[in-house]
Amino acid sequence: MTMPGNRAASNSPALAGRVALITGASGGIGQALGRRLAAAGARLALAYGANGAPAKDLAAEIIATGGHAVPVQADLRSAEAPAALIEATEDKLGPVDVLVSNAGLGRRQSVEEIASSDFDDMIAVNLRSPFLLAQRVVPGMRERGFGRILFVSSVAAFTGGSVGPHYAASKAGLHGLTHYLAVRLASHGITVNALAPALITGTAMLPGDPEELRARIPVGRLGRPEEVADLAIAVLGNAYLTNQVIGLDGGMYPR
């Protein structure tokens, strides 16, 4: 199946027919991930929070072009939501083979402005929910001898970023989770990786004037959600790549 505007529409044998759950499917990166995974032949659960229209529209678009997709609502601030989301996905599509944990909060606050409830919400969505989702899908992946887990992090995990300490801490936690899971699951055919994008259009990743930011980026422009999705497909389709956190920032933050 070829999705509109997809330069990376070649099917990945590793992903064709697999059930893939994407959280944050209403955002710019989530939408691009959905289109790329559909083009790779995956059957999709598109999870969304408060804003369901984009995820529902994307599901309809994928179905209209011959693919399989269902929108699923989940408030990932709730500790019960990840289990309910996995259950709903499995009821509609079957066991989850590919987990792309992309949902995230990014409320900008200074150290002085952050209440304990703000910190708790950030950790709940950005770190606890990815862990709980992975915890639910790993047993089935291990039993089937195949699994792909991809966490969408941020360069804020490396640099501290500009959103706030609660955001940076939550994203840094994802890197630790990635490394812990990857080492222990590799022998079961499960890969675990993370992407750390920055300065992507159509997202909340732009801490300032786009023109000023563009001038500071070595490649001379902002990134596109489709470029994040292209990298995600390459990572998910590679059985030898695991335990990696890959930056995608136009060369702005060398590591």
Short names for language-model regions:
Residues 154:
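Residue(s) in the substrate-gating loop at a strand-loop-helix junction
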Residues 139, 183-184:
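Alpha-helical segment proximal to the catalytic Tyr-Lys
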Residues 134, 170, 178:
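Active-site helix of classical SDR
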Residues 42-57:
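Conserved glycine-rich Rossmann-like NAD(P)H-binding loop of the short-chain dehydrogenase/reductase
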Residues 19, 26-27:
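Conserved glycine-rich cofactor-binding loop
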Residues 224-248, 253:
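C-terminal substrate-recognition "lid" of short-chain dehydrogenase/reductases
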Residues 110-111, 118-123, 213:
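Substrate-binding pocket helix/loop in short-chain dehydrogenase/reductase
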